Swiss-Prot record:
Organism annotation: Amycolatopsis orientalis
Pathway: Antibiotic biosynthesis; vancomycin biosynthesis
Pfam entry (one): ECH_1
Signal peptide location: none
Keywords: Antibiotic biosynthesis, Lyase
Biological process according to GO: fatty acid beta-oxidation; vancomycin biosynthetic process
Membership in a protein family: Belongs to the enoyl-CoA hydratase/isomerase family.
An MF annotation (GO) of this entry: enoyl-CoA hydratase activity
InterPro entries, A to Z: ClpP/crotonase-like_dom_sf, EnCoAhydt_DpgD, Enoyl-CoA_hyd/isom_CS, Enoyl-CoA_hydra/iso, Enoyl-CoA_hydra_C
Protein's gene: dpgD
Enzymatic reactions: a (3S)-3-hydroxyacyl-CoA = a (2E)-enoyl-CoA + H2O; a 4-saturated-(3S)-3-hydroxyacyl-CoA = a (3E)-enoyl-CoA + H2O
EC number: 4.2.1.17
Role of this protein: Involved in the biosynthesis of the nonproteinogenic amino acid monomer (S)-3,5-dihydroxyphenylglycine (Dpg) responsible of the production of vancomycin and teicoplanin antibiotics. Catalyzes the syn-addition of a water molecule across the double bond of a trans-2-enoyl-CoA thioester, resulting in the formation of a beta-hydroxyacyl-CoA thioester. Physiologically, DpgD could act as a dehydratase, facilitating the aromatization of the DPA-S-DgpA or DPA-S-CoA intermediate. It can use the non physiological substrates crotonyl-CoA and beta-methylcrotonyl-CoA.
Domain of life: Bacteria
Protein's name in the database: Enoyl-CoA-hydratase
Length: 265
């Protein structure tokens, strides 16, 4: 039996998801997508998990995206090329179109985040990049399309002209430029990357877990709604939060001048 493609660990309320094919710069084949889908299912179901760190093994790449050698073999065998989203493909729904994942995902990026790797980054909630990180959607140079969300998310996260420049040319973006455009939260030297990620996950874990889930859901679901409609829309995790013991505990702890004890209930 071949080795697993993804390492999955949990510690202190944080799930660590590592794409583990460093010899091919963590290129994603169908088996990796299948493993990741099972992991995302577990992350959502496990109430002890309050945050996720997604990264790639080694120091050369977060992920260079689709395994193009596998794609070439599939093309030769008559398997239809992919288009938008992961419907009908291995590992559906993938993170890029798993719109109900309520836990915050932190991308830890070293080296290349290209194609589907960059699309994963765009789907994360917080992005911490090393100074050597490089981002690009090179599909246009390969007769492909950034169908795992790149063509949709990049124009939502950048000014339109800036996004179109990268989408239509496949040009690369360095970490400093990504920070300037607001695509990443912090850029740090590689030696400081793990500590910076830990600082962010510590903050997430200290926060009320139901509040985190409610805020993520409401913020992402409402982003394209008219403001009046956003206020009147019902949000599942906000209904859970406002009826929770944690909603009482947080205020009580503040009044009693102590740290809150979150139960997620």
């Amino acid at each position: 039996m071949s080795e697993t493609r993804v390492r999955y660990e949990k510690k202190d309320h944080v799930a660590y998801v590592t794409m583990d094919r460093p010899a091919v710069l963590n290129a994603m084949d169908r088996r990796m997508h299948e493993e990741l889908a099972g992991i995302w299912d577990d992350v959502e179901a496990d109430d002890d998990v309050r945050a996720v760190v997604l990264t790639g093994a080694g120091d050369r790449a977060f992920s260079v995206g689709q395994d193009l050698k596998e794609r070439a073999r599939l093309n030769e065998s008559g398997v239809a090329p992919t288009t938008f989203g992961s419907g009908g493909q291995a590992g559906h729904p993938r993170l890029t179109d798993r719109f109900t994942l309520s836990k915050p995902v932190v991308a830890r990026v070293r080296g290349y985040a290209l194609g589907g790797g960059f699309e994963l980054v765009l789907a994360c909630d917080i992005v911490i990049a090393a100074e050597d990180a490089v981002f690009a959607l090179p599909e246009v140079r390969l007769g492909l399309i950034a169908g795992a969300g790149g063509v949709f998310r990049l124009p939502r996260q950048l000014p339109q002209k800036v996004a179109m420049g990268y989408l239509l040319t496949g040009r690369r973006m360095d970490a400093a430029t990504a920070l300037r455009h607001g695509l990443v939260n912090e850029v740090v030297p590689a030696a400081e990357l793990d500590q910076c990620v830990a600082d962010w996950t510590d903050s997430l874990v200290r926060a009320a877990p139901l509040s985190v889930r409610a805020i993520k859901e409401a913020a992402l679901r409402s982003v394209d709604l008219p403001l009046e409609e956003a206020f009147t829309t019902s949000y599942h995790w906000e209904e859970r939060r406002r009826r929770s013991a944690d909603a009482i505990e947080g205020v009580r702890a503040f009044a009693e001048k102590r740290d809150p004890i979150w139960t997620g209930q």
